[in-house]
Curated annotation (Swiss-Prot):
Keywords per UniProt: ATP-binding, Coenzyme A biosynthesis, Cytoplasm, Magnesium, Nucleotide-binding, Nucleotidyltransferase, Transferase
Record localization: Cytoplasm
ATP-binding recorded as keyword: yes
EC number(s) recorded for this UniProt protein: 2.7.7.3
Marked site (Transition state stabilizer) residue numbers: 17
Cofactor(s) for this UniProt protein: Mg(2+)
Protein name stated in the entry: Phosphopantetheine adenylyltransferase
Binding positions (substrate): 9, 41, 78, 92
Cited Pfam families: CTP_transf_like (PF01467)
Species of provenance: Bartonella henselae (strain ATCC 49882 / DSM 28221 / CCUG 30454 / Houston 1) (Rochalimaea henselae)
Amino acid sequence: MKIALYAGSFDPLTNGHLDILKASFVLADKVIVAIGIQAKKESLFSFEERVDLITQAGKELLNMGSDRLQVISFETLLIDKAREIGASFLIRGLRDGTDLDYEMQMAGMNGLMAPELQTVFLPAGVLGRVITSTLVRQIASMGGDVAPFVPANVARALHLKFQSSRGSDCVS
């Protein structure tokens, strides 16, 4: 069984992430989405919320059975988690040349430390090339419509998250 490991923060999951996830299923029997947990990095969504959002979007939009998609966390080196779960290869999405430069450095280091693990680069679709989780969070925080950039369940979750924070900023 070919197992792909697709790692990121997914805070929030975007349609660009889903494009890469969907393409991963062409190459792998199972895709494990690994959410990186960094104590120093403050996330908008908790790990549990991100698991739910990814799982729901994966099932709804990708029409995949739950046995082909798994969501886990990791706080170690990615290669250590990949070895632990028996991953066949790592998946990395590319939006542009800047991503390629960074990802080639990471793949090089990973290859030196874990030569048995290959990194597979998947190009983002045309619409996914301009989407970043950071931009989506900024748009949502200002009350903008993020529906074109994220799955419907994520758009709802962002709306609720920022609606409650904007409501608490109001002065009576």
